[in-house]
Amino acid sequence: MNSLLMITACLVLIGTVWAKKDGYLVDKTGCKKTCYKLGENDFCNRECKWKHIGGSYGYCYGFGCYCEGMSDSTPTWPLPNKRCGKK
């Protein structure tokens, strides 16, 4: 029983360490980072792969840069308690 509990705890820990998130990049005003060329987009891909973002791939979806594989600390749209362009 103890070994089963220990294995479960290890799996949960591994999942949280390797967890990556997907979402829309936000600019300094809290809005989605805008793009116009839908689908594969060099601008979005470059923005997502920046060192402080840590994403693995980015593309334009719904006129916003959508990133995959970002670190959990990267803010994504919508920001809690903040509307786009409002304080």
Curated annotation (Swiss-Prot):
Source taxonomy: Eukaryota, Metazoa, Ecdysozoa, Arthropoda, Chelicerata
GO CC terms: extracellular region
GO BP term, pick one: defense response
Keywords associated with the record: Amidation, Disulfide bond, Ion channel impairing toxin, Neurotoxin, Secreted, Signal, Toxin, Voltage-gated sodium channel impairing toxin
S-S bonds: 31-84, 35-60, 44-65, 48-67
Domain characteristics, as noted in the entry: Has the structural arrangement of an alpha-helix connected to antiparallel beta-sheets by disulfide bonds (CS-alpha/beta).
Expressed in which tissues: Expressed by the venom gland.
Residues with PTM Cysteine amide: 84
Organism: Centruroides tecomanus
Protein name (record): Beta-toxin Ct17
Protein location: Secreted
